[in-house]
């Protein structure tokens, strides 16, 4: 190898180890895993995974038509719309909580929604949806962009309606993008802490419980639950990589 290649490889190894070593150390020193059988921990996992599933389903329902429109149509202010849809990825997490709370209580006609959002399961779903929708929309939009419009055109010239072409031709061709969007949106949602602290501390999600255990009892008390979340994250991104390879074939 040339010196340049060696230098580049050193940077790769350093950044890889920067991420890999702490994770491996954590997994090899998980603390008392019996904590994962604690009723409060089990309930937190149930709440987190269920809220993540509901938010991801809603994101999917809205993400498919949104991604299709962004991929297939040009319209005024399209760039602005795309920028707004991407904003949740750039806004600090705690600020997202303030934004949602301010909107709910700042507009009189929707004040009543507060009782269903603040310290409520649906508040968790709302936050998860807010932070996860950009990943769903972007993945699906990229999928539609990768489908040759000529295929859809041929389908319609052969007598298929636009809606039939959409469901029988376009959607099946982007199934891996849809799955990737689901995984990314779900993973982003269940990892949220800052906005949840402000909107819905209760019922407790896993990240909130980890934060609470750490603040109350220290590092050792938070490690086993953290390991549980790490394993879920690894499983999700293993699936993502698998479907990514399938999409590239």
Curated annotation (Swiss-Prot):
Subcellular location: Cell membrane
Regions of this protein lying in the Extracellular compartment: 27-48, 115-116, 199-223
Pfam families: BPD_transp_1
Residue stretches spanning the membrane: 6-26, 49-69, 94-114, 117-137, 178-198, 224-244
Keywords associated with the record: Cell membrane, Membrane, Molybdenum, Transmembrane, Transmembrane helix, Transport
PROSITE patterns recorded: ABC_TM1
GO cellular component, one term: plasma membrane
Domain ABC transmembrane type-1, chain residue ranges per copy: 45-240
GO biological process: transmembrane transport
Side Cytoplasmic, residues: 1-5, 70-93, 138-177, 245-249
Membrane topology (UniProt): Multi-pass membrane protein
Keyword ATP-binding: no
Summary of the function given for this chain in its UniProt record: Part of the ABC transporter complex WtpABC involved in molybdate/tungstate import. Probably responsible for the translocation of the substrate across the membrane.
Subunit details: The complex is composed of two ATP-binding proteins (WtpC), two transmembrane proteins (WtpB) and a solute-binding protein (WtpA).
Family: Belongs to the binding-protein-dependent transport system permease family.
Listed name of the protein: Molybdate/tungstate transport system permease protein WtpB
Natural source organism: Methanocaldococcus jannaschii (strain ATCC 43067 / DSM 2661 / JAL-1 / JCM 10045 / NBRC 100440) (Methanococcus jannaschii)
Gene it is expressed from: wtpB
